[in-house]
């Protein structure tokens, strides 16, 4: 089955083999992230910075987790990853949040920007989140490249790199490209 969310608040499932609609539902707000799937659930984030968990069989909402909202519509998509029993995601003001896959209960949250970002969020952009299973890596257009511990949400380190491209993790080496076009490699110990 193909799972789809769109920018007019619809989410649906299509049978790939026959091209038939399995189910269609309409949410409260448009969606602003990719879809991630695990077992019988899928996850997405809407424009109100709410992570939503849906049943894959009929689209029923299982739970949701609201983070801080903003007054403007961001022009970049939010990112989410699933690592073990956690869904880890960013919102449009730079918070990184980890919640339990089954219950939606918060495990940790890390604000990466000052409260002033709410007024500047239309201009704030981040890369997609990536993980090596122990840490999360991402960067933003505020010259910050982060490594965050998955279990605790504690910042391992921050480097001065201005990039919104998705980092690539190969072993203990992280590759990214800066806004100025430089290929950078970081060794993560």
What would you call each of these model-derived segments?
Residues 1, 20-39, 60-84, 105-133, ...:
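Extracytoplasmic beta-rich repeat domains
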Residues 187-189:
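Conserved small/polar residues in nucleotide/adenosyl-binding loops
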Residues 138-146, 152-155, 163-166:
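Beta-propeller domains
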Residues 6-7, 46-47, 84, 91-92, ...:
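Structural signature of WD-repeat beta-propellers
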């Amino acid at each position: 089955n193909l799972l789809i969310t769109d920018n007019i608040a619809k989410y649906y499932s299509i049978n790939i083999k026959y091209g038939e609609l399995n189910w269609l539902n309409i949410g409260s707000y448009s969606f602003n992230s990719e879809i991630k799937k695990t077992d019988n659930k899928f996850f997405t984030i809407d424009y109100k910075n709410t992570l939503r968990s849906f049943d894959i069989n009929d689209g029923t909402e299982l739970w949701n987790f609201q983070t801080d909202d903003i007054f403007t519509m961001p022009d970049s998509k939010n990112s989410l990853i699933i690592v073990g029993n956690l869904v880890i995601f960013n919102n449009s003001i730079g918070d990184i949040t980890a919640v339990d896959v089954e219950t939606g209960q918060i495990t940790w949250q890390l604000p990466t920007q000052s409260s002033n970002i709410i007024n500047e969020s239309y201009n704030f952009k981040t890369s997609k989140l990536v993980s090596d299973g122990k840490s999360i890596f991402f960067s933003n257009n505020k010259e910050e490249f982060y490594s965050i511990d998955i279990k605790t949400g504690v910042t391992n380190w921050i480097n001065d790199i201005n990039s919104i491209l998705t980092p690539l993790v190969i072993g203990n080496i992280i590759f990214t490209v800066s806004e100025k076009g430089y290929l950078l490699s970081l060794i993560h110990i």
